[in-house]
Amino acid sequence: MAAVDSRGEVLDVQALPLPYFLLRARVAAMEPAQPGQFVMVAGADRSEPYLRRAFSVYDQEPASDGSLVISLLGKVIGRGTEALAACVPGERIPVLGPLGTGFHSVADDASKSGRAALVAGGIGSAGLGLLAQALERARRSFDFFYGGRSAEDLVEAETFRRLSERTGGRLVRTTEDGSAGERGLITTPLEEGLRAGAGYTTVFTCGPHGLMAAVARIAAAGGVAGEAATETPMGCGYGACLGCAVTLKNGGYALCCRQGPVFRLDEVAW
């Protein structure tokens, strides 16, 4: 699947609990993304910041005119994300994608059995949106573990509740301040579920590095395979800048934008 550099028309920007936002754009030439793939985007004013920002394709829908409507779930952190959150309908923004390698276990027919656990930390839920939809279409049951510092960090929680419940699964929430779900870290109910024989055959995760490292440890202890959609600073999105290296257990490196962003849990040196 070849990436295409084009201009996307902003359809709307939905304000979520600060500092989160959901941007929808119509892209004429882009092919549908696979779960876990991403795009490089920037605001309508390209004068500053110069570099684009990497965003997971959170949702997508083919339009009747042959274009693709993509949804990007974001968090305002700096000037780049601030510019995207400030976009207005009708503005045209640069979009390069789809990029990277998605979740392997979704494409592998041999892995489409058994229950799955999806584990997200905060805005990491954006990297699991298409995956949750793919699992639902495959009629594969999954539980969605969603953790954050506070209730405001569990954006789109109801979307993941609906998707998981349609498969016979459930949404599990934790927050560090106890404002939503149980107080604590989301890795605690995941570990308890594995010990209690929840029957997970695959674990998928996206979020802060510490969360994914903990999920990798828990999955290994439970003898369960898994994959992580990693996040690193990224300058170009296609391997030219070499700025998004991920350290592997074999002592080598892989580029998050090319070989990733999805890696097996057991191949990354967390």
PLM regions with names:
Residues 1-91:
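Ferredoxin-reductase
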Residues 12, 59, 173-175, 228, ...:
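Structural signal for conserved beta-strand scaffold positions within catalytic alpha/beta enzyme cores
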Residues 44-46, 98, 249:
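Short, surface-exposed secondary-structure boundary micro-motifs
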Residues 79-228, 233:
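FNR/FR-type flavoprotein reductase catalytic core
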Residues 127, 209-210, 232-262:
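Local cysteine-cluster metal-coordination motifs and their immediate loop/turn environment
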Residues 264-270:
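A charged, well-structured terminal subsegment
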